[in-house]
């Protein structure tokens, strides 16, 4: 303070010594950062608006056409990173899973090859889906999903990796099992009933059915880790989650 009072303030001398172009460059940089922040906010806003609008439309359709009902939705945490895991037997499963989570915006993992379709590509972009190359160990996509989870997002996955050919539950894929073990967040098992009858693999049109979703209790990350007999046994973690999903199925289901 004494130096500034006597007229020799180094900060003031530094600021006064900046040429005019320096001030313009600094102002332009700050303006660019502000624009980038606004663009990010707009993109996040429109993505959220698209998700909730699409969810409302899908939910209305599922309830009217398939009398969809959900049991145990209260088991889905309202905030914080969480993985929503369900069985997979139909292309209807992703929107059904999203409709079964009333308070969460769900980011899905999807097969990258599906985005080759123009309209699906636009849809996945709007939904901010995490695109996964299923045929190659896509570590980048798995890390992106883990990052989303650590940021507090809800990520929806189908551990089987593909639609069941006969509606029965299949084994979890290795990459997804790796994600379940590494995410360190609760995993909520969900069983979807009725979508296989409504629109099975290879179907060209929708068939009559009733859709029901049963949501189980969250599996703590500690339990998933303890399920592995040795470090790196991700298959055991995947098997635990698939067992919990199967336990939610009606008694007459395999």
Predicted regions and their residues:
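Glycine-rich, highly charged phosphate/nucleotide-binding loops
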Residues: 67-69, 136-142
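Catalytic core of membrane glycerolipid acyltransferases/transacylases, capturing the structured
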Residues: 45-52, 63-64, 77-136
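Short gly/ser/thr-rich secondary-structure transition/capping motifs
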Residues: 63-71, 196-197
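Generic structural signal for residues in well-ordered beta-strands
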Residues: 68-70, 129, 187, 213
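Short, basic, glycine/proline-bearing loop/turn elements
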Residues: 57-59, 126-132, 159-162
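Non-catalytic C-terminal accessory region of glycerolipid acyltransferases
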Residues: 3-32, 140-254
């Amino acid at each position: 303070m004494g130096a500034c009072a006597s007229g020799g303030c180094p900060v003031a001398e530094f600021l006064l010594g900046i040429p005019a172009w320096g001030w313009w460059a600094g102002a332009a940089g700050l303006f660019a950062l502000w624009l980038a922040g606004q663009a990010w906010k707009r993109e996040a806003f429109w993505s959220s608006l698209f998700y909730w609008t699409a969810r409302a439309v899908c939910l209305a359709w599922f309830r009217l056409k398939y009398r969809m009902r959900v049991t145990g939705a209260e088991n889905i945490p309202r905030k914080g990173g969480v993985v929503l895991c369900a069985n997979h037997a139909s292309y209807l499963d992703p929107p059904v899973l999203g409709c079964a989570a009333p308070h969460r915006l769900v980011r899905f993992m999807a097969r990258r090859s599906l985005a080759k379709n123009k309209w699906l590509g636009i849809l996945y972009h709007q939904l901010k889906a995490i695109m996964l190359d299923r045929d190659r160990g896509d570590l980048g996509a798995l890390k992106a999903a883990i990052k989303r989870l650590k940021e507090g997002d809800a990520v929806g996955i189908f551990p089987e990796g593909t639609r069941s050919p006969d509606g029965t539950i299949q084994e979890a894929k290795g990459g997804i099992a790796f994600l379940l073990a590494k995410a360190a967040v609760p995993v909520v098992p969900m069983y979807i009933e009725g979508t296989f009858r409504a629109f099975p693999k290879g179907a060209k049109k929708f068939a009559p059915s009733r859709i029901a979703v049963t949501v189980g209790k969250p599996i703590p990350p500690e339990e998933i880790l303890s399920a592995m007999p040795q470090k790196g046994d991700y298959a055991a973690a995947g098997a635990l989650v698939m067992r919990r999903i199967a336990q939610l199925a009606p008694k007459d289901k395999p």
